[in-house]
Amino acid sequence: MRLLAGWLCLSLASVWLARRMWTLRSPLSRSLYVNMTSGPGGPAAAAGGGKDTHQWYVCNREKLCESLQSVFVQSYLDQGTQIFLNNSIEKSGWLFIQLYHSFVSSVFSLFMSRTSINGLLGRGSMFVFSPDQFQRLLRINPDWKTHRLLDLGAGDGEVTKIMSPHFEEIYATELSETMIWQLQKKKYRVLGINEWQNTGFQYDVISCLNLLDRCDQPLTLLKDIRSVLEPTQGRVILALVLPFHPYVENVGGKWEKPSEILEIKGQNWEEQVNSLPEVFRKAGFVVEAFTRLPYLCEGDMYNDYYVLDDAVFVLRPV
């Protein structure tokens, strides 16, 4: 037992020391690490670090249908987004931390999903919008406040934290036990997957951020959201990665097609956006505003950060 305790203390001390002394900013150390871990089965290259950030926000309005042209909100790289990027770049350079994460992920992926592993390690935080971008999209001021927020599929709660100053009560749902643990540490009220629809009260804002392409019944989910949203002033803020590639993650990192398929058509971002108002109409919503934003994730030893193209909508019930 003493030997085990000593080994654990030594491991923790090594991690702490590595965090302070080692980074992958050095070309030599990064090359050494990649050579140690790369191979035919290594991860594919991501978009982090090399893409012109201006392109993350570009929308060709001429390709949008008329009803969407008038509600498009142009977004830009702002201070809140830049802070997230800077922090992610710094974390990706912690050599021994990244080695430790890689080892744990390899072992735990045999019986845990990638999402749960990230929750256990406290890594892989997502970024959808900054406080300023959230306020501009909802057309609210920094002091605006209402009663209840429900964040569906909240992950580790970092995006929830950006919205939380505007709400008196904050509810969240999450499948991953380790992510639920992260949410509870932030003092959010976690509801069960089949509980949030049956609480007996309504929500003023419901966020559904990058969830529709990762759930088994996305249209049913939209209709359930409509049924518990405050019917006059309630709003939904919904983010969706485009191009649309739906799949459901199971234990062990296996992927399956969802049982409900949304009719999203088109080959590029604008074309797929044009097909979404009809999807929302079937669930009882109309688009009040939307924008294009990068969906960012903290990086690792391979990339400073990861990025996908998001369409973020504000929906009102009809």
From Swiss-Prot:
Binding-site positions, S-adenosyl-L-homocysteine: 174, 210, 295
GO terms, molecular function: protein-L-histidine N-pros-methyltransferase activity
Localization: Endoplasmic reticulum; Mitochondrion
GO biological process: methylation
First-tier enzyme category under EC: transferase
Main subcellular location: endoplasmic reticulum
InterPro entries xref list: METL9, SAM-dependent_MTases_sf
UniProt keywords, alphabetically: Endoplasmic reticulum, Glycoprotein, Methyltransferase, Mitochondrion, Signal, Transferase
Effect of residue 153 to R: Abolished protein-histidine N-methyltransferase activity
Residues of this chain annotated as glycosylated in UniProt: 35
Presence of the UniProt keyword Heme in the record: no
Catalytic activity, EC: 2.1.1.-
Signal peptide: 1-18
Tissue specificity of this protein: Expressed in liver, colon, small intestine, skin, kidney and to a lesser extent in spleen, lung, thymus and stomach. Not detected in fibroblast and endothelial cells.
Catalytic reaction equation(s): L-histidyl-[protein] + S-adenosyl-L-methionine = N(pros)-methyl-L-histidyl-[protein] + S-adenosyl-L-homocysteine + H(+)
Reported impact of residue 175 to A: Reduced protein-histidine N-methyltransferase activity
Gene3D superfamilies named among the record's database cross-references: Vaccinia Virus protein VP39
Origin: domain of life: Eukaryota
Gene Ontology, cellular component aspect: endoplasmic reticulum; mitochondrion
Role noted for this protein: Protein-histidine N-methyltransferase that specifically catalyzes 1-methylhistidine (pros-methylhistidine) methylation of target proteins. Specifically methylates the second His of proteins with a His-x-His (HxH) motif (where 'x' is preferably a small amino acid), while exploiting the first one as a recognition signature. Catalyzes methylation of target proteins such as S100A9, NDUFB3, SLC39A5, SLC39A7, ARMC6 and DNAJB12; 1-methylhistidine modification may affect the binding of zinc and other metals to its target proteins.
Family statement: Belongs to the METTL9 family.
Protein name: Protein-L-histidine N-pros-methyltransferase
Lineage start: Eukaryota, Metazoa, Chordata, Craniata, Vertebrata
